[in-house]
């Protein structure tokens, strides 16, 4: 009877129902992997593996360019971005392109240019992927010794890690240069309702930047998600970029320490598991960031955060009832607490009613009305500006609630039908991606550790039920 798994590999292999199937001249017998195992068949064919990765990058960039142009074609300047189902243009607007005071979109040409540039670069990547997959050398180091690598070569792997870190550091500095020198970025906190500005006074104090990492993730502390001014965000990118670049140089110049050589598994599947674990952490962090943070993700483009929409509702009705003669400082609600205003656990004046749970919200349209002890009653009576009323009424009716199938918004709000917040989409998608990547991390880590320990050789095929079944035709 044939051996249906490769004795050369210590890795679990699924059985093909039809063992005669051969794809691209590589069948399960010769490679140890079934046709659907994709890049696993290319583990030792560095040229073809390069082609697969370059082609994959081309697909990603093609999607970005095509989706970008699709959003430009459908964009209407008379409605806010978050009402139009856009997920890419808000990112470009946040970078300061095409935006005027108050977050108004005044020019869509930069968005068109972005889409075209991505399409052109995707064509270059696509050509490179096809070339390396079909025409280039199967094993690239036979032609270019510089690119020789073996998965178990710890020194070469850390050199590759170093190169990746340097590229990530350069990416972080691209945002820094955009904010400092190339037109600035959109600041939702700019006076009068937000504007594009250059960042001139970076926060570089390590106690502030790394203080975010040491904060509690709970309540008003909010870990790194609590960052609420662009000086801190851009300064943080200076730190991250510098650490990545210097760390990359260090990894290129050094060899792994003995403890690292012992503690880590050095195989292709292990590196895959480490990468998936890191991406999982990124996904969960991005989920929290886009859901709660209205500085890095301005509400003008992404819609209000949940707490922001709730506080906006309380503010809108306070404005209305105050105009009708209500004394908002004294009126009691059905609970005996203040109907419009009450005190937080720390004694600050906050909005009353159900929105009290969001008392530590900070938002650009609300902060001018605060004094040293929370909301200032005098300012609420005399200083509310029309733009604050308009914005809160808009945010009240566009809460990031509901399902992802275009019946979101506040259930009782007739104007919110067929509205789904990009915040809901981005937070949900990144949570799901973070979860699945974490499962993938556990799966591949378990396989890699088992292979390293030498006991993972797949299922005993002699008694596998499928062998007694009729082959699929």
UniProtKB/Swiss-Prot annotation:
It holds the Pfam family PSII. Binds multiple chlorophylls and provides some of the ligands for the Ca-4Mn-5O cluster of the oxygen-evolving complex. It may also provide a ligand for a Cl- that is required for oxygen evolution. PSII binds additional chlorophylls, carotenoids and specific lipids. It comes from Cuscuta gronovii. GO terms for biological process: photosynthetic electron transport in photosystem II. Its main location: plastid. PSII is composed of 1 copy each of membrane proteins PsbA, PsbB, PsbC, PsbD, PsbE, PsbF, PsbH, PsbI, PsbJ, PsbK, PsbL, PsbM, PsbT, PsbX, PsbY, PsbZ, Psb30/Ycf12, at least 3 peripheral proteins of the oxygen-evolving complex and a large number of cofactors. It forms dimeric complexes. Belongs to the PsbB/PsbC family. PsbC subfamily. The modification Phosphothreonine is found at residue 15. The keyword Heme does not apply. GO terms for molecular function: chlorophyll binding; electron transporter, transferring electrons within the cyclic electron transport pathway of photosynthesis activity; metal ion binding. The modification N-acetylthreonine is found at residue 15. This is Photosystem II CP43 reaction center protein. The chain crosses the membrane at residues 69-93, 134-155, 178-200, 255-275, 291-312, 447-471. It is found in: Plastid membrane. GO terms for cellular component: photosystem II; plastid membrane; thylakoid membrane. The keyword Plastid applies. The gene is psbC.
